[in-house]
């Protein structure tokens, strides 16, 4: 008699769930536009002509992304410029640089 480790039942249940999900996604029951009972069932033409609440949401997203890019860019630019500046009061420039050339 074979011993089962439980993966076969798990595989069968996963296969059944995925098959049901695939059937639901490919059915045309969810995406039928048309008049129906209730105020929520409007046709596509009428729904497209109504002003939506989130019509300009993409502009808000672009604005936030632009502000983030400016902030990060200014931080990177400020950091790299601060590292490039040669400070004359740096001990390397005061004591070591001139003496190395003498050796």
Curated annotation (Swiss-Prot):
Pfam families hit by this protein: ISK_Channel
Coiled coil: none
GO CC, alphabetical: basolateral part of cell; cytoplasm; dendrite; membrane raft; neuronal cell body membrane; perikaryon; plasma membrane; vesicle
Family classification: Belongs to the potassium channel KCNE family.
InterPro entries tied to this protein: K_chnl_KCNE, K_chnl_volt-dep_bsu_KCNE3
Keyword Chaperone (UniProt): no
Biological function: Ancillary protein that functions as a regulatory subunit of the voltage-gated potassium (Kv) channel complex composed of pore-forming and potassium-conducting alpha subunits and of regulatory beta subunits. KCNE3 beta subunit modulates the gating kinetics and enhances stability of the channel complex. Alters the gating of the delayed rectifier Kv channel containing KCNB1 alpha subunit. Associates with KCNC4/Kv3.4 alpha subunit to form the subthreshold Kv channel in skeletal muscle and to establish the resting membrane potential (RMP) in muscle cells.
Bilayer topology annotation: Single-pass type I membrane protein
Start and end residues of each stretch annotated as Interaction with KCNQ1: 68-79
Keyword rRNA-binding: no
A GO molecular function held by the record: potassium channel regulator activity
Gene Ontology biological process terms from the UniProt entry: intracellular chloride ion homeostasis; negative regulation of delayed rectifier potassium channel activity; negative regulation of membrane repolarization during ventricular cardiac muscle cell action potential; negative regulation of potassium ion export across plasma membrane; potassium ion transmembrane transport; regulation of heart rate by cardiac conduction; sodium ion transport
Key words, A-Z: Cell membrane, Cell projection, Cytoplasm, Glycoprotein, Ion transport, Membrane, Potassium, Potassium transport, Transmembrane, Transmembrane helix, Transport
Subunit structure: Interacts with KCNB1. Interacts with KCNC2. Associates with KCNC4/Kv3.4. Interacts with KCNQ1; associates with a KCNQ1:KCNE3 stoichiometry of 4:4; produces a current with nearly instantaneous activation with a linear current-voltage relationship and alters membrane raft localization; affects KCNQ1 structure and gating properties.
Primary localization class, coarse: membrane
Protein name: Potassium voltage-gated channel subfamily E member 3
Annotated region described as Disordered, given as residue ranges: 30-52
Glycosylation positions in this chain: 5, 22, 41
Residue ranges annotated as Cytoplasmic topological domain: 78-103
Highest taxon in the source lineage: Eukaryota
TM annotation in the entry: 57-77
UniProt subcellular location: Cell membrane; Cytoplasm; Perikaryon; Cell projection, Dendrite
């Amino acid at each position: 008699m074979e011993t089962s480790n439980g993966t076969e039942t798990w595989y069968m249940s996963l296969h059944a769930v995925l098959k049901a999900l695939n059937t639901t996604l490919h059915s045309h029951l969810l995406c039928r536009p048309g008049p129906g009972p209730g105020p929520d069932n409007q046709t596509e033409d009428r729904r497209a002509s109504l002003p939506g609440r989130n019509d300009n949401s993409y502009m808000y997203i672009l604005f936030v992304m632009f502000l983030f890019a400016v902030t990060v860019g200014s931080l990177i630019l400020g950091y790299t410029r601060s590292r490039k500046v040669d400070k004359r009061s740096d001990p390397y420039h005061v004591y070591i640089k001139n003496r190395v050339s003498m050796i």
